[in-house]
């Protein structure tokens, strides 16, 4: 049986994600972000609810990406997630993309030319953001073309880099329905952006989200719930440069901007430059919010949930892999657990996110 890995945020889970799970074959293992997202924002609903939605709609195992994988630029996000999935025995990685190209060929390009490609990046002017530099690199060394806003395609290129030497097959699936950033409601497969934008339209949500009650009946979180905490952290921090990725220039810009910013969008707009993209600034603000410093990664893999089929696979791995099914007196990952505690502060109805929680188990008969 083919073991397929999928890297996801499911923020929130929607019909497009269900389509992806129905399209790929075999046992499906999801490496999913926790309570903070790659583009620097809190999850709309907590990681346990998102895991349950995935398991009820085709996923067999959901594992958690540690904080310092979830909240990172595309290359580090991809590398950390693929490293975890490879430990779980995946043979292929499936992902949605706007442009279906031969990503397998790009793995071979990177395997042969990684040193030259990395050296080329260092020759590009500092006024370019890292994503802009990366696009230029792929254009020069592999002839990859970029057309407009294609975030999934760009992430696919990071998957290709991270898969070098891993002996896994990349399985791109053409993205269906609305574009990634589209707010349009007139699609059967609406985007996560549209769903977050129209949360009060229950008819739209019920048609766009499988098991919509799980989304509708749980707290909906955003930066608005944490902005006052962030402001306190910035104004009272003695040395912002001790925070991960904060240099003197950014520390100064952030300290000045917070005094005149009324919300997160205003703050990000004020701090961002050509060099410091809005996504990067948002991630850095998350680091400040949770007081993240030197990045460390846990050895164990935190299991958020599984089906009967997934449980059978995990039993084969448990003697040779450090699988964590319950966080007790001993921590799994201190940084992720601290971030979970801060996420909880945003709403009184968010339950405990780490200590004592056990995996969600969905019984099914799909054991063949």
From Swiss-Prot:
E.C. numbers: 6.3.4.-
InterPro entries on file: Rossmann-like_a/b/a_fold, tRNA(Met)_cyd_acetate_ligase
Listed Pfam families: HIGH_NTase1
Key words, A-Z: ATP-binding, Cytoplasm, Ligase, Nucleotide-binding, RNA-binding, tRNA processing, tRNA-binding
Cysteine-cysteine disulfides: none
Cell location: Cytoplasm
GO CC terms, sorted: cytoplasm
Protein name (Swiss-Prot/TrEMBL): tRNA(Met) cytidine acetate ligase
Source organism per UniProt: Streptococcus pyogenes serotype M5 (strain Manfredo)
